[in-house]
Amino acid sequence: MNVSAIVVEYNPMHNGHLYHIKKTKKLTNCDALVCIMSGNFVQRGFPSILDKWTKANIAISNGVDLVIELPTLYSLSSAEFFSFGAVSILDSLNIINSICFGSEIGNINALQDIATTLLEEPLEYKILLKNYLDKGISFAKARNLALVELNRDNKIMSENISKILSLSNNILGIEYLKSLLLLNSSIKPFTITREGADYKDENLHEEYSSASSIRKYLKENKNINILKDFLPLEGFLEFKRLITKGYNFSMEDSMINYIRYKYISGYKNLHNLIDVSEGLDNRIYKSLEKNFTYDSLVGEIKSKRYAYSRIGRILCQYFIGFENYDLNSLLKSTPNYMRVLASNEMGLKVLKKIKKHSSINIYTKLPKNTNTLLSLDIKATNAYSLLNNNIRFNEDYFRSPTIIKNTIY
């Protein structure tokens, strides 16, 4: 059985994601497609607009065979740890033949060259990186500048690196490749050219609109029918059904009052979070005292050194309670379990193969004794239940994976 994998967030799933699924199947000629997906919180530091079970069901209805949850620790981490968490789980299954991700460049060799340099970190690169960091530049920007200068004698390569590293999907793809190299994985990487609007684009476009634009529309409008052209049919019908039921779509603004209440209640322990350094905690506390919306809060805190997404993740981690965990130790280890969210009949065959070839713990129901990583997932869902009244406290203990039969793909 030829099994391919994709790493996704689906916040929410749109036509660009469906394109990714179809192109992956065509490019890899796979018999089955496994998807590892962020759960109730996503990498930019937002709550997912739909709960993880609903997202998983929509994915199965659109051509995925098995959906595995990416632990919250990784889904709310930097691109480096987000990618490592996903790839390490896929690698430990011992049955994944390939992974396919979208990138703006669509050239696997160019991304592979950069990934190799970043992983090996030659001495000149380290020196250049330190020099830029000492100037107060953010790590991501400093890394880009160091790579460009490292290749200054090759003008074409230098210009290409600068362009490649300015685009988010290229950066994430490089991190997937770094993780594969670090793990000495046999999984073969593929990339496809990303189609559609940039993820930051908040305007709806024909055929391929960004998840940001769809969330913005749902936040500001009640006429769901407008989105029919931008969502896969099964996803659109599910949105209509959820609206009829009075489903509570979760947006980032829904966290703000809980975050402010936690702060004024005396929980001033942001310094325990990995991404918080150099007095950033005090900067956040001061902003919490005078900002009442998510955008105004993050907008005031972010700076040349602290990117919007980093601040968003810090706030989301604080909301959930990450500061009470030993995050350094957790991130240095690799996950020893996979949590199944949904499957079809082909996915069940994939699960049987995983059981045969891997020692990883497979959870379709939560065990009585949970490890720290899994307990953080449970805590995240409980925090999410404050934002989405369709999700119960301890929902993780009540839900089993959905098995969907007779999907059309």
From Swiss-Prot:
ATP binds at residues 7-20, 102, 169, 194. GO terms for cellular component: cytoplasm. It catalyses: cytidine(34) in elongator tRNA(Met) + acetate + ATP = N(4)-acetylcytidine(34) in elongator tRNA(Met) + AMP + diphosphate. It is found in: Cytoplasm. One of its GO terms (molecular function) is ligase activity, forming carbon-nitrogen bonds. It holds the Pfam family HIGH_NTase1. Catalyzes the formation of N(4)-acetylcytidine (ac(4)C) at the wobble position of elongator tRNA(Met), using acetate and ATP as substrates. First activates an acetate ion to form acetyladenylate (Ac-AMP) and then transfers the acetyl group to tRNA to form ac(4)C34. This is tRNA(Met) cytidine acetate ligase. The gene is tmcAL.
